[in-house]
């Protein structure tokens, strides 16, 4: 609905607009520019329940916009289009499915070492791994060499979102003014617990205004969050979500992080937080096609923390610690063991993901710990039955 005549038609006669394709699929791009279509679509669909009549695309979800009078519950399915996964970028022959693979590894009784399950060929060089995380998954900037040309794309993209899309969605120029500063603050934290008071203070706005800006950024798919985990396990865990810029390429651009800076003090810490956001992002992409149903969260109580908790549909969990180093020792899985002991049979797998090039399995006080390269997220083989 970027074209004036199409948008005016949709606004003036939404029923007629929706019926113009007759028995074909009507594709409506940038549908959020005519919010009145939602209620009209409900009426049209109720008269003819054939699936696949409409494909609605846009830079935000039409059905989540304020003022949209119907959710189309039971009549529509929302699919989020993420940036490209690493398996897609590598032209993997079959979609990567890390959660399904790690479950097949842990349930195997015939494999003596995880190395037999894992492809050691073509392991990315440590510097290449850093480059992968910092580049992100947006197709267009990946066509450009790192540096000024790629930075210009990110700069132009964010400027247009702030001055056009944000203003149009919010109906106020205030959002455009604060969107980029907000994203810069979030980018500088990598993936971190959201402390609204601190972020609002840094922006010089109220927490109420910050909540509005965050909701807008989420509707524009610019930020993602994972909830605090612990329901059914403990009441003492932190419930604050962890939040991050949705694409690590955008986050690296906003924070000025490069491969060279990631190797130095200050940049090394930011890269570690960005690596965690990258791993969550890859799991989130795979979640849309995985054979397993799962949710993603984090866990913290007192001095114990689990970077990523993958909870399966049956209540079992995969506990993941992220390390931005090339070597790890038993200290890396200290909290995994502690929490794993309390969870008992609920733990389906305990994993440390790091920047090394070896896939290892350790047995420590009755716990089986898998130490896997970050590249295992997309370079694992097809699951085999044990």
Where are these regions (language model features)?
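Short regulatory helix/loop adjacent to the ATP-binding pocket of P-loop NTPases
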Residues: 62-78, 90-95
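Short glycine-rich substrate-engagement loop in P-loop NTPases that contacts/grips substrate
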Residues: 1-25
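Conserved P-loop NTPase "ATPase switch" module shared by AAA+ and STAND
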Residues: 21-37
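Conserved small helical "lid"/interfacial subdomain of P-loop NTPases
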Residues: 83-103
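Interdomain hinge/linker elements that couple catalytic modules in large macromolecular machines
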Residues: 96-261, 265-274, 281, 296
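A cross-kingdom feature that marks ATP-driven nucleic-acid transaction machinery
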Residues: 1-3, 216, 221-386
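Conserved catalytic/switch belt of AAA+ P-loop NTPases
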Residues: 38-56, 60-62, 70
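Conserved ATPase-coupling elements of RecA-like P-loop NTPase cores
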Residues: 4-10, 32-41, 66-67
């Amino acid at each position: 609905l970027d074209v004036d005549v199409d948008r005016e038609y949709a606004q003036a006669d939404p029923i007629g607009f929706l019926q113009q394709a007759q028995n074909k699929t009507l594709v409506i791009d940038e549908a959020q520019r005519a919010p009145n279509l939602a209620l009209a679509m409900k009426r049209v669909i109720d008269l003819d329940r054939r699936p696949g009549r409409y494909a609605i695309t846009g830079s935000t979800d039409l059905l989540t916009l304020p003022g949209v009078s119907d959710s189309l519950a039971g009549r529509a399915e929302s699919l989020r289009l993420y940036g490209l996964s690493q398996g897609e970028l590598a032209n993997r022959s079959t979609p990567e499915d890390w959660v399904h693979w790690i479950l097949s590894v842990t349930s195997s009784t015939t494999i003596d070492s995880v190395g037999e399950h894992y492809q050691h060929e073509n392991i990315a060089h440590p510097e290449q791994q850093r480059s992968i995380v910092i580049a992100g998954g947006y197709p267009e900037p990946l066509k450009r060499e790192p540096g000024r040309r790629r930075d210009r794309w990110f700069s132009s993209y964010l400027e247009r979102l702030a001055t056009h899309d944000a203003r149009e969605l919010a109906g106020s120029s205030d959002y455009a003014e604060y969107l980029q500063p907000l994203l810069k603050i979030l980018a500088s934290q990598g993936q971190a617990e959201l402390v609204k008071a601190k972020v609002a203070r840094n922006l010089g706005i109220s927490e109420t205004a910050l909540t509005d800006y965050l909701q807008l950024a989420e509707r524009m798919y610019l930020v993602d969050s994972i909830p605090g985990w612990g329901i059914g396990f403990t009441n003492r865990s932190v419930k604050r979500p962890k939040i991050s810029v949705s694409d690590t390429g955008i986050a690296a651009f906003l924070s000025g992080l490069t491969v060279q800076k990631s190797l130095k003090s200050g940049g090394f810490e930011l890269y570690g937080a960005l690596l965690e956001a990258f791993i969550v992002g890859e799991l989130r992409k795979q979640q849309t096609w995985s054979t397993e149903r799962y949710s993603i969260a984090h866990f913290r109580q007192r001095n114990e923390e689990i970077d990523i908790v993958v909870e399966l549909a049956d209540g079992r969990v995969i506990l993941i610690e992220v390390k931005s180093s090339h070597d790890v020792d038993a200290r890396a899985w200290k909290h995994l063991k502690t929490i794993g002991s309390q969870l008992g049979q609920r733990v389906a797998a305990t994993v440390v993901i790091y920047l090394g090039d070896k896939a290892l399995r350790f047995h420590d006080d009755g716990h089986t710990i898998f130490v896997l390269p970050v590249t295992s997220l997309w370079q694992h083989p097809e699951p085999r039955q044990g």
